[in-house]
């Protein structure tokens, strides 16, 4: 059977993710598989995610951009994801092609070690913090289904602004000298 954890009212993606990790750790899970509730990700990829964790990876992302082309994803979302992924790849020194995927598997150790500060989303924060703390990250190609319009993120621009703020905050916390140094240098350029 499954253990279902729910909130009486919508607390957002990040809080739901935190509750999920807490419950999984209380249940003594070794590997945690996360998928969004909208049915976008096909569960037949779950064994592949778990297999990669068993091979020694700490965080395995299901990438919608490795392999097949994402024709059903709106252009603005696709463009934003590619841009986020390039920035995250640069910050983490790990090749990331799908930084907003909600389909991932990770170790209990990673769940215990990463403390989330964001109240908005968890996707980029988990990747950055896992990389900065030395956890091994990889991706597997997955298929995804077209889903209805997002109820969480009605405005892609608003999502992008909040996500960029989150990325800058994490970068500032992990690399303060580089972060403030680059800001300072920009004033003297």
Residue map of PLM features:
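Acidic donor-binding segment of Leloir-type glycosyltransferases
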Residues: 1-5
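Hydrophobic alpha-helix-in-membranes signature
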Residues: 41-42, 140
């Amino acid at each position: 059977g499954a253990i279902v954890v729910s909130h009486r009212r919508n607390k957002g993606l990040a809080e739901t993710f935190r509750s999920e990790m807490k419950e999984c750790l209380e249940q003594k899970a070794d590997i945690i598989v996360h998928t969004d509730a909208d049915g976008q990700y096909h569960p037949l990829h779950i064994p592949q995610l778990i297999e990669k964790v068993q091979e020694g990876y700490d965080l395995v992302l299901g990438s919608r951009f490795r392999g097949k082309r994402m024709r059903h994803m709106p252009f603005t979302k696709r463009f934003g994801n590619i841009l986020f992924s390039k920035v995250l790849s640069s910050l983490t020194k790990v090749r990331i092609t799908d930084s907003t995927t909600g389909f991932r598997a990770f170790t209990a150790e990673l769940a215990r070690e990463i403390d989330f500060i964001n109240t908005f989303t968890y996707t980029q924060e988990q990747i950055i913090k896992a990389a900065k703390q030395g956890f091994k990250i990889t991706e597997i190609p997955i298929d995804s289904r077209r889903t209805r319009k997002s109820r969480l993120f009605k405005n892609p621009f608003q999502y992008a602004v909040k996500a960029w703020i989150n990325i800058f905050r994490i970068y500032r916390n992990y690399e303060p000298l580089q972060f403030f140094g680059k800001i300072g240098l920009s004033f003297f350029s």
